[in-house]
């Protein structure tokens, strides 16, 4: 009887401990990749400091032929920042208060309200201090969130990846590459490998090709661009062309 009472007491203790414990236990971060919730007073958000933050977070992704923002932002007033909003994966909290802060400073915390979450806090005594900080550290915020998302993707791909891509590249091209697991359609030739998720929306394609090194000009931008164009022209004739590539799309492995 004493043993049963001890077990019941221990069980009740564990239940109470779980009920009283705070933190992100059991809560997973929500939201989509490259989305950030900005928590900031409305007056500041509508003012010059908010404009500076918006311009940085939505700055163009470098290297793309068209304009595309690096991050998608959602604004929330501090008075409404509660509940499910606190579980979002990327959060930026901006505090402007001259009675508390003497200079602009930035910090971050992982897993504050949910696992897999990062919360960045930017404190400053004035809107001008926010602007000065942004000018002194251009793209610091956007680069941080982009790096966080890249690391998340790396961690996910280390655990869950396409064995089709990995096995073909490893066996036929002496390469190892962790591609998204939904990339199961592929075409493989001697010097050219293509994989795709073949999705109607959100389609993702991966291309790997090799060519011989001939002279130092091989590594110039002009040569690499010309080589890329010639390889893709040969292997990707376009949707209108009924070529081996188009046929491969309809009957892939």
Residue ranges and their predicted role:
Residues 1-10:
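Bacterial N-terminal signal peptides that target proteins for export
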Residues 16-19:
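C-terminal motif of bacterial Sec signal peptides marking the signal peptidase cleavage site
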């Amino acid at each position: 009887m004493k043993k049963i009472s001890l077990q019941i007491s221990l069980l009740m203790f564990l239940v109470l401990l779980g009920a009283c414990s705070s933190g992100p236990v059991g809560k997973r971060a929500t939201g989509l990749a490259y989305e950030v919730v900005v928590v900031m007073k409305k007056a500041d958000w509508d003012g010059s400091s908010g404009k500076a933050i918006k311009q940085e977070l939505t700055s163009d992704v470098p290297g793309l032929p068209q304009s595309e923002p690096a991050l998608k932002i959602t604004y929330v007033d501090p008075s409404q920042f509660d509940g499910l909003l606190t579980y979002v994966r990327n959060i930026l909290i901006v505090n402007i208060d001259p009675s508390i802060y003497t200079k602009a400073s930035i910090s971050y915390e992982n897993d504050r309200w949910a696992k897999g979450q990062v919360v960045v806090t930017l404190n400053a005594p004035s809107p001008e201090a926010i602007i000065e900080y942004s000018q002194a550290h251009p793209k610091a915020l956007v680069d941080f969130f982009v790096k966080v998302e890249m690391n998340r993707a790396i961690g996910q791909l280390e655990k869950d990846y396409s064995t089709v891509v990995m096995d073909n590249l490893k066996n036929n091209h002496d390469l190892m590459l962790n591609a998204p697991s939904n990339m199961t359609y592929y075409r493989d030739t001697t010097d050219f490998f293509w994989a795709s998720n073949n999705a109607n929306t959100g389609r993702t394609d991966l291309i790997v090709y090799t060519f011989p090194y001939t002279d130092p000009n091989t590594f110039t931008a002009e040569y690499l661009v010309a080589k890329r164009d010639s390889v893709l022209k040969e292997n990707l004739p376009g949707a209108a062309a009924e070529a081996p590539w188009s046929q491969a799309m309809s009957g892939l492995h």
